[in-house]
From Swiss-Prot:
GO molecular function terms attached to this record: DNA binding
Gene3D superfamilies, A to Z: 2.40.50.580, 3.40.1350.60
Originating species: Methanococcoides burtonii (strain DSM 6242 / NBRC 107633 / OCM 468 / ACE-M)
InterPro entries given in the database record: SfsA, SfsA_C, SfsA_N
UniProt protein name: Sugar fermentation stimulation protein homolog
NCBIfam families per the UniProt record, alphabetical: sfsA (TIGR00230)
Pfam families to which the protein is assigned, alphabetical: SfsA, SfsA_N
Gene transcribed to yield this protein: sfsA
Amino acid sequence: MVRNDLVMEIPWDIEATLLSRPNRFLGIVEMDESTSSGPFQEKVHIHDPGRLEDLLYPGNRLLLRKATNPKRKTGWDVIAAKADDGWILINSIFHRRIAEWAIANKVCSCFENVLEVIPEQKFGDSRLDFLLKKSDTELWVEVKGCTLIYGNTATFPDAPTTRGKRHVGELKKALESGSEALILIIILRKDALCFKANASIDPDFAEVFKDAVNAGVQVCPLVFGYEGRELFYKGMVPLCTEEYNSI
């Protein structure tokens, strides 16, 4: 990967240390700034449904941004968490904007000749992330954010995902109906060199993923790095294994 294209600015306000995670969407942190009585704690919102056990553990460092809604129960949003390869964006609210950037900049070949981008379109029993109208066909796109890495292998999911399995199954049905279909993987670990479905965490998802790819559903794994207050596109990586016969 040799790209380093600026995607967007994602500012943050303060660093903090994670103390605990009472539930998926709530964290308790100790803020770096102190009051006259010493360090203080805050409740923060975690905008990512994954386990993130390699990033959200007691003692790890976080980047926070002040929430703009004064009526919220949590006054801060978690933007990123510290890892060996730098700060990792773990706020999934940005995934749609990242995907829109990728589509607009045609970083995957299947994004050529797109005439219209329709978000959140219903197909079957699911609502898929995008329907792209092209000059000669239509392309259904489902976006998956990936923050888990083993060595240089990025993998999804980090927890069993019935919803993810259903979405991939719907993409295969879209393909069978005559449309094109794509799984867009947003990898937020810049050391990643390849991607694979996480069979050790969710073997059912891995099997559905494999079946979809072998049937002709396209996969576009894109690597992004969060540096300073900016997100950069680093390039596309392949699938890790040779078990997908259509790649």
